[in-house]
Amino acid sequence: MEKTSSRIILAAISALCVSSNVGAMQQFIDPKDGMFDASQWVLDNAIGFMPVPIIITDPAVGVGGGAAMLFFHESEKRKQLREENPDEVVGLPPSVTAVAAAGTENGSWLTGAFHFGSWQEDTWRYQGGLFYGSFNLKYYAGDVPFDFNIDGLYFMQDIDYRIAGSNWFVGAKYSLLSSKSTFDIGFDIPSIPPIDFDLEDAGVELKVTYDSRDTIFTPNDGLKAKFSTDFHNTAFGGDVDYQKARAQVNYFAPVREDLIIGVRGDYQTVSDDAPYYARPFISMRGIAAMRYQGQDMALAELEARYDVTPRWSIVGFTGTGKAVEDGQSFSDADYQSVVGGGFRYLVARQLNMRVGVDAAKGPEEWAYYITVGHAWQL
């Protein structure tokens, strides 16, 4: 249920709303190259909310969609830098408030509100959200799937502080998930109803982040790494006690002006007493959410983007990962690998924001994705 700030911001670009007023269309034309561009529409729309369509294509929940209402808040400093340097990408991220609702073909749905704020020239970064939803998913015991539903309320507050103007941040996050899970055990016996249980899960995350990326949207250069430890405890308002630790790295480098290479790594581990939904799973394009879970998870991914023109690009990617069960050695766990490709269009030059479509082949199926910004969110 958690939404990251960049995903909410990126969703606004995917709308590409076109006004019927001929004069209003001028804000969608970039004076630099005469191409379609949404930078001005996103950054200069300072009055009222914007309706934004949401497209969902995750194989775990099926195809679906929804809508969001977003309001951008650009600081005076960021606006000044953008207007003084219209050909440059301003590194300071805008703030955004959103209200959204979405549903999919398998009956899953989500609604909620979110705010991302960046203050004092990006010294402080804040995220806060409240969401309610219901998800119909599959839980795998080995290769045997069991249908289940989880519905509930998710609340989160997240703050990061930049250390002395450097690329290092320290931060903390509080989250509370109040949920009900219902499992269909697969036996058509009237006297045995589906198994269900309620759970309150509250936790505090402590984290250290390094971020030198040139933009939060579609980076061409830079590194973002985050090291975090989560403490879930009854003292924070929950019913369960467990811990999680995670290390994530996304690195981007321009091999040439028109060729960008990205490398991603992700490692997660969780204590024995974690609830089923908190167990790490392999998260890559081509693999459904929660398909391969374990007590430990590690993955690596490589992506290349070639800019055919300044606006149009093609991408290719591959990756592999393992989900390791308790008591199982890393070497005994099977690799789960993906390969895929797609295309991108530079839809907002002043944000270096690219959108497009990806197709990926995983161990069991093909999957298709609408990609807004970069597929790797951290």
Where are these regions (language model features)?
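N-terminal signal peptide c-region/cleavage motif recognized by signal peptidases
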Residues: 18-21
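Transmembrane beta-strand segments that form the barrel wall of outer-membrane beta-barrel proteins
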Residues: 38, 48-57, 93-103, 111, ...
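Gram-negative/organellar outer-membrane beta-barrel architecture
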Residues: 42-49, 55-200, 353-354, 360-367, ...
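Hydrophobic, lipid-facing positions within transmembrane beta-strands of outer-membrane proteins
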Residues: 49, 65-67, 109-113, 151-157, ...
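C-terminal outer-membrane beta-barrel translocator/porin domains of Gram-negative envelope proteins
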Residues: 204-320, 324-326
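Predominantly the C-terminal beta-signal and adjacent terminal strand-loop region
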Residues: 208, 265, 329, 333-334, ...
